[in-house]
Amino acid sequence: MEAMLPLFEPKGRVLLVDGHHLAYRTFFALKGLTTSRGEPVQAVYGFAKSLLKALKEDGYKAVFVVFDAKAPSFRHEAYEAYKAGRAPTPEDFPRQLALIKELVDLLGFTRLEVPGYEADDVLATLAKNPEKEGYEVRILTADRDLDQLVSDRVAVLHPEGHLITPEWLWQKYGLKPEQWVDFRALVGDPSDNLPGVKGIGEKTALKLLKEWGSLENLLKNLDRVKPENVREKIKAHLEDLRLSLELSRVRTDLPLEVDLAQGREPDREGLRAFLERLEFGSLLHEFGLLEAPAPLEEAPWPPPEGAFVGFVLSRPEPMWAELKALAACRDGRVHRAADPLAGLKDLKEVRGLLAKDLAVLASREGLDLVPGDDPMLLAYLLDPSNTTPEGVARRYGGEWTEDAAHRALLSERLHRNLLKRLQGEEKLLWLYHEVEKPLSRVLAHMEATGVRLDVAYLQALSLELAEEIRRLEEEVFRLAGHPFNLNSRDQLERVLFDELRLPALGKTQKTGKRSTSAAVLEALREAHPIVEKILQHRELTKLKNTYVDPLPSLVHPNTGRLHTRFNQTATATGRLSSSDPNLQNIPVRTPLGQRIRRAFVAEAGWALVALDYSQIELRVLAHLSGDENLIRVFQEGKDIHTQTASWMFGVPPEAVDPLMRRAAKTVNFGVLYGMSAHRLSQELAIPYEEAVAFIERYFQSFPKVRAWIEKTLEEGRKRGYVETLFGRRRYVPDLNARVKSVREAAERMAFNMPVQGTAADLMKLAMVKLFPRLREMGARMLLQVHDELLLEAPQAGAEEVAALAKEAMEKAYPLAVPLEVEVGMGEDWLSAKG
């Protein structure tokens, strides 16, 4: 058993913790941290981490944690407006505060709440008693009110780590501790609604105290205070000043019995259960509650069947990596392979964290290894924020090390623990066994297969783009009147807003400078010809630097093909993503994006087959909402955008013009992503009131869509998560946020996820069902991008493969509306799209 972190040490030092303040601070600092059940725990985690940091840096004879009592304090009675300006307590803060108090009790620390007094007064009184007995005192808080207590033996320990001492106050402000209350009284404190002296800021207050020494002396000599306007401000707010002084001064005379020996031994088992319940796996280690890594029980290679595998690669990309180490674990016994590559031949299946990666590497070496159970997939289904093995290990009680044997052991333990957590979750288990686990086999094969690139074409395109970029630069310089660095945002800012005097439409958050973002430039497109040229320059430069130039260097020398990585546990909706390179971001509709697709070509004697789900998200919406009008449009094979326009504008379908159809299309897809009337008015360049009317007419045309959205949000608020048709979850705790902008962003996320996630599940199901049949026909699955699947088949059988794939995708799962797939074939990806 690992030695527990020493919580008490007889070093003559006492730690006082401002519990309420620390909890509130971490509540907002770590917003969004939840358990896999969607339970918000950010304040609890942040509080525990802050405590650990303090405890590790120093040993303490006693630890006291002080919270504000529920009853009003004497300050509320003296000043009715005290703290009246504070925002209401967030809804899930009280529940987390209760958990923090439970944690304090389990740690054996003394917990105090004194009715009628704030935590500041309790802390101040506690600080004075040990100080008198010769102990050093540390007060863990970020509350600046308590800086008045610092002395030779009392220091404030800021959660970020620095100590506030008399020397620190003097160096930072030129103030002595006894002047701190006077300083606070002069400047006031908006967070506590303390008025201070209106018009006097920190700079003036420091100057006054430097000259007069104290507030008392300043007030005695008020008629001599200069300048006159400062003197008059103080005279006009004397009552506020005296009140602020009274309220800022903490009490040190509370009738408290302080026993430095009253702390208890921590409840080790209770603490372990608490941390496991909240999924604070990393804290188990930090508190010293994990089983000590006992010497591994080792056995000779090869391992028995069903063992979990651990491995270490020289780099993340398996097609390019060296296999540095290989081990396996079964029932706690580990087996190390002396020669990792040779050891692969003894495996029939890869079970373990990142199983797909090892299967890809094995395929590169000519071995057909099937990826099997992967705890990463289980963790991802529990909570899609579980995206890395390091994070999963920390969360569920383990450590991701660079040792292959420990990785194998970790995989076995995590698999067992995660399956326990999924007991009773039939939908999630179905997704694991029927979708995610078999899909990892498909993706491993796709990664190992890769896709051929026309390198000569890309090199020629690069030269062409370089010339076009140079021409655009000359145009920009001509319009600006002089050359400048187009890649320098500061120089561009000066040209646009100082020299050409274009309107500045926004500022950057970090620096406050005038923004030159794409959104700002789009809004300025019509304001000056230079903007259009800059946007074109940016697009060409980005695609040249991101795709056209790097792609040839990513072609593997042994295969002559490009091998992208498909990430199965990276998105919150269940969609796949790709990396090294990221093919999802190649523009589909722009001419240049299409020219990049032209570089993806078929092997000689083969053809590419491109299959694209048509309007799959709108079809999923029809099924989920059960809206009869929406369902009927798809069942009858009508154009959804034309029909929507017909209902929205009150005209027959044959009278719908292109502008009407475009408006309806924007609304159809905008509804899926929670587009506001303001955004719609910008997209369509129409008045705001007209955009509001468009959205309202849409919901009148499809009334059950609105009802489904409202039902989805209501269930999400109650359960803390939303789910797809197949039960895939996304936790959305901010559905209950009090801040309107935060809540509305969560709402858009919440009703989009079931649609987008169901579409992703349908694509995955289709891939799993189609894969073995393609292999039988000698065809290959190459890429999955957005709603599209790219295959490669011998030319002689390409049409048969296309027909088979189209049928498999359209019949992936029965819905209330038919799924429709558009098919094309060609020598390259662009021509296959038609």
Curated annotation (Swiss-Prot):
Nucleotidyltransferase listed as a keyword: yes
Family membership noted in the UniProt record: Belongs to the DNA polymerase type-A family.
GO biological process entries: DNA-templated DNA replication; double-strand break repair
InterPro entries: 5-3_exonucl_a-hlix_arch_N, 5-3_exonuclease, 5-3_exonuclease_C_sf, DNA-dir_DNA_pol_A_CS, DNA-dir_DNA_pol_A_palm_dom, DNA/RNA_pol_sf, DNA_polI_H3TH, DNA_polymerase_1
Keywords: DNA damage, DNA repair, DNA replication, DNA-binding, DNA-directed DNA polymerase, Exonuclease, Hydrolase, Nuclease, Nucleotidyltransferase, Transferase
Residue ranges occupied by any 5'-3' exonuclease domain in the UniProt entry: 176-262
PROSITE patterns in alphabetical order: DNA_POLYMERASE_A
UniProt-annotated stretches for the region Polymerase: 412-834
Catalysed reaction equations from the record: DNA(n) + a 2'-deoxyribonucleoside 5'-triphosphate = DNA(n+1) + diphosphate
Top-level taxon of the source organism: Bacteria
Function: Has 5'-3' exonuclease activity and no 3'-5' exonuclease activity.
EC number: 2.7.7.7
Gene: polA
GO MF: 5'-3' exonuclease activity; DNA binding; DNA-directed DNA polymerase activity; nucleoside binding
A Pfam family it matches: Taq-exonuc
Organism of origin: Thermus caldophilus
Temperature dependence: Thermostable.
Protein name: DNA polymerase I, thermostable
Top-level EC class: transferase
